[in-house]
Amino acid sequence: MIKNKKKKSYTSVYALGQYISMSAHKARRVIDQIRGRSYEEALMILELMPYRGCYPIFKLVYSAAANASHNKGLKETNLVISKAEVNQGNTVKKLKPRARGRSYPIKRSTCHITIVLEDTSLYQQYDEYLMYFKKPGCSNENKNLTCYDTYSSGGLWDKK
């Protein structure tokens, strides 16, 4: 059996929160709002959302950014939430005593949340490099990355 080895990524960091006492369904509602957004935008969204699940997720996103800046020296302005997943954890079961010697079960669900942040500065530099060679009118003699473009000349937008 051949196993795929994970490549070491130098541009991504993660934070894992286990046994967070919250339903996985309720945590997913919050996670779906921040997936794919930038780090700063996600923090603003999490601060303003009125759900109880926002605070633990806010702490995880903040922790992942601290891991990025401390462990790998990445800038927080270039970070994007590339992967955010919520898995169901253990269910804590208790008994609540009721009248006449009876008891009702109480189920307290937990979840595991993983936040992966990725640095986009490397990709932005690569995209600028590719766009430099794809645009018409660009040549290798030009040292700066400005090329002739139909939008910059005003030819396309001047006519109505």
Swiss-Prot record:
Primary subcellular site in the record, as a coarse category: plastid
Biological processes, Gene Ontology terms: translation
Annotated compartments: Plastid, Chloroplast
Record-level Gene Ontology MF annotations: rRNA binding; structural constituent of ribosome
GO CC term (a single one): large ribosomal subunit
Role of this protein: This protein binds specifically to 23S rRNA.
Sequence similarity: Belongs to the universal ribosomal protein uL22 family.
HAMAP family from the UniProt entry: Ribosomal_uL22_B (MF_01331_B)
Subunit structure: Part of the 50S ribosomal subunit.
PANTHER family: CHLOROPLAST 50S RIBOSOMAL PROTEIN L22-RELATED, LARGE RIBOSOMAL SUBUNIT PROTEIN UL22M
Protein name: Large ribosomal subunit protein uL22c
Organism of origin: Draba nemorosa
